[in-house]
């Protein structure tokens, strides 16, 4: 009986996370910038200067953002900045923050790739590395250090029990 209850609870939690992620990806994308240029033929759009993009519970800021469209909707967002930042409120109200010099977001897959000076903050834990991939739907991440030397390893800071954010 306990195993059955656990299995049901597990799948319910996964379903709720997926519904929240799908709801976010179905929201309208709002963009503010100093400059924009678009090709109606290809759907490619580039924004420059204090660019802010929001979609549901997701906010991205960068110096330059490119949006690639297919079949009438945005498929990927590529950001450059020193740094580019992302804030995402998860379904459990946890605020996830990310920053990197290069940030890309796959709208359909709900995955963020952070490259060059990448940092991810989630529920008090801080992850730093050369690159981090974060799946917003599954709430999973992978981090990689740089290839040059041992100085470029990943760093993981886990707060002590009782620290705010846990």
Residue ranges and their predicted role:
Residues 1-166:
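Mature-chain termini and adjacent capping regions
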């Amino acid at each position: 009986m306990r195993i059955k209850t656990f299995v049901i609870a597990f799948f319910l939690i996964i379903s709720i996370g997926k519904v929240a992620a799908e709801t976010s990806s179905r929201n309208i994308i709002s963009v503010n910038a100093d400059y924009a240029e678009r090709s109606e033929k290809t759907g490619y759009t580039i924004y420059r200067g204090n660019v802010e993009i929001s979609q549901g519970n997701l906010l991205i800021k960068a110096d330059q953002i490119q949006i690639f469209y297919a079949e009438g909707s945005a498929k990927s967002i590529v950001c450059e900045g020193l740094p580019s930042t992302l804030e995402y409120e998860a379904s459990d109200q946890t605020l996830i923050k990310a920053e990197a010099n290069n940030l890309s977001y796959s709208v359909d897959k709900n995955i963020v790739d952070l490259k060059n000076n990448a940092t991810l903050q989630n529920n008090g834990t801080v992850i730093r590395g050369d690159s981090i991939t974060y799946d917003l739907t599954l709430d999973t991440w992978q981090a990689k250090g740089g290839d040059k030397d041992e100085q470029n390893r990943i760093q993981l800071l886990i707060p002590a029990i009782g620290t705010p954010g846990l």
